């Protein structure tokens, strides 16, 4: 039996992700990390910066994050990226 290693609950939600080398869509998000699909290139061990767009009734917000790529996986022409968030901030879009 495998022991669950996650510290925070994951929420399955599709949100737009913006990176320097592409765009993507989240599959799931937690307080300490997220998984997203993107058309671009990332490898395990990379340190990346990215933004997640959050839509609210009164306007958009951007969650700006830095993190380390824990693992990647392939699906057709997309790359799945699991990221551990090291720091983040929220801004009005």
Predicted feature residues:
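Short, solvent-exposed secondary-structure boundary/capping segments
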Residues: 75-86
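Conserved hydrophobic positions within beta-strands
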Residues: 26, 67-69
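Short coil-to-beta-strand transition motifs
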Residues: 18-21, 59-66
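Short, charged beta-turn/beta-strand-edge "cap" motif at the junction between a beta-strand
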Residues: 53-58
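Short, conserved beta-turn/loop elements at beta-strand boundaries and strand-helix junctions
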Residues: 31, 72-77
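N-terminal helix initiation/capping motif
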Residues: 1-29
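Short, surface-exposed secondary-structure edge patches
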Residues: 37-42, 72
